[in-house]
């Protein structure tokens, strides 16, 4: 895969950790890695490494590669979360990276962008699945961080599979008390899950940048939930009334309307 923007800028390409060029299709690119289509049924997440392509078509690794994430933290998290329903199936590590099952239906963000409003029951199923998968992460002492529509893939049966734990925090299983790390807390994970719930109900993507408690959005920074099903629950969550995903789930499950046919 070559990157070439202007004639005077050297061509660069993605490389594996052994220096060989990445020749497979790159499906996605995050801050720390590439997702490549490794086989019909698998993808491989590899460190984000580049090389300059020299005039004789040999390659020279970029010096910035020394700062690349080696994915060992994410590997430990996928190992901790193995078997958790709703997490992308982790198939182990190779010399190149992390092997995961391929989900050909794309992300919930793509689905929202490209499809009309789904039936009420489908959206409710997604909402409860999403809360459950991230609550299970918290129960396994994983502080997730990157909770977004783009990181929720759709399996063949349209159930959810969560990916991207590159920035997540792994805490000792025997540890008790609040999950928190450098100002980021489990409540901020609740905020980002709530933004996804709003997005699915309004069928319009909404997200905020919030990585510290003091960046929590105020009422002017979030959309109105008037006339939105479960709008009062979302408004309560945005005003920090739920400390855990379990609390949020209980309230949603108990106040879930049968559903406007297509709201």
What are these regions (language model features)?
Residues 51-52, 107, 170-172:
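Conserved protein kinase catalytic core
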